[in-house]
């Protein structure tokens, strides 16, 4: 708990003190991080209670923790410009991340580095830490505007069968859903944070 508080406090300070150390970011700041966090939490809990299928949300507190962390840190250390600008100006970040989802890679990398440094992941097993890092980075990377429709298309396809079964008064519409393996769950989590961002 104290480690999480330390990382959240450091993240808040980072949002308040931008990379250039001069100009506060008027949009990608601590308030935006908190707004996306609360919106994602609300949407996740609403999905959990409204759907007749668990999405692995009911029985897995790790999922709620992971999406919460991803939402809070999705714009961590944002420099106040967009990917296009970074690529066009040949910024070091663009070079580091090969012109692909530059800011999102930066946010994910820096967030995971902070969480490790502040020992948030210290007591996680190797398997859990790996799952955490994969889930959080995937959610943050999905906030890239270039990929905005990717998660939506995947989730729409999955739920089309489910909705058809519900509208057809099928007594067990959940049988038309694939078992919610990690890939499907990940797409739903990605979409939640994309919508909230």
Range-by-range predicted roles:
Residues 55-196:
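Divalent metal-dependent catalytic cores for phosphoryl transfer on phosphate-bearing substrates
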Residues 1-101:
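Acidic/His-rich, divalent-metal-binding segments that scaffold phosphate/diphosphate chemistry
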